[in-house]
Design a protein with these regions (language model features):
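N-terminal beta1-alpha1 ligand-phosphate binding loop
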Residues: 2-24, 186-187
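Short acidic low-complexity segments
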Residues: 26-37
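Beta-strand-turn-beta hairpins that frame and shape the catalytic cleft
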Residues: 141, 175-179
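Acyltransferase
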Residues: 182-203
């Protein structure tokens, strides 16, 4: 069973619908107890970093999520959910979850007046960790739908799963151990997103 954390700031319905298309069993979880009962977890999120961290901490699920990660359960962060997996963000002052050591920086299109912020729309990604389970069966070149103003900079380049270029090379997806994060929206990315979520659901 895949648990999608519902803490008041995520695109829950669209993610559940896409997971249903993969054939996976998935439910929205709102308590630490229901979270702990799931074998895989998705942390969605849209909006501001500090608000996301505050709502997650207030939800009563933070401790159970920490325990799930420590126990080796697969966890996938999406969009803001991915950003929260890291250490910090220039967008706010809150500490992130700290599961993967990366920080979020704001796009600064200096010298690239044609690039608008936020980075929005379809874009190509390059797979860095080609042997990772999450990218198996993914059609190449892979394209995903983005909407974000901040990008991840990993302290260890070995944590970069996919890269994208938008005036700067950035980590479009990250991976360390049982924790995965994607900056794009797989639930809005048609066959590419369907394949990625299928791979996550089957491990």
């Amino acid at each position: 069973m895949i648990g999608v954390l519902d803490y008041g700031i995520g695109n829950i319905g669209s993610i559940l619908n896409m997971l249903k298309k993969t054939g996976a069993e998935a439910v929205a979880v709102t308590t630490g107890e229901s979270l702990s009962a799931c074998g895989r977890l998705i942390l969605p999120g849209v909006g501001a970093f500090d608000q996301g961290m505050a709502l997650l901490n207030q939800s009563g699920m933070r401790g159970a999520l920490d325990e799930a990660v420590a126990s080796g359960k697969p966890v996938l962060g999406i969009c803001l959910g991915m950003q929260m997996l890291g250490l910090r963000s220039e967008e706010g002052s809150s500490e992130g979850l700290g599961y993967i050591p990366f920080s979020m920086r704001r796009f600064r299109p200096d010298g690239h007046p044609e690039l608008k912020v936020p980075h929005m729309g379809w874009d190509r990604v390059e797979i860095v960790q080609r042997g990772a389970s999450l990218v198996q069966g993914l059609e190449q070149p892979a394209r995903f739908y983005f909407i974000h103003s901040y990008y991840a900079v990993c302290e260890d380049t070995g944590d970069v799963l996919m890269e994208c270029d938008y005036g700067v090379h950035f980590a479009a997806a990250v991976h360390r151990g049982n924790v995965w994060g994607v900056q794009f929206h797989p639930e809005k990315s048609h066959r590419f997103g369907l394949q990625l979520l299928t791979s996550f659901s089957r491990g």
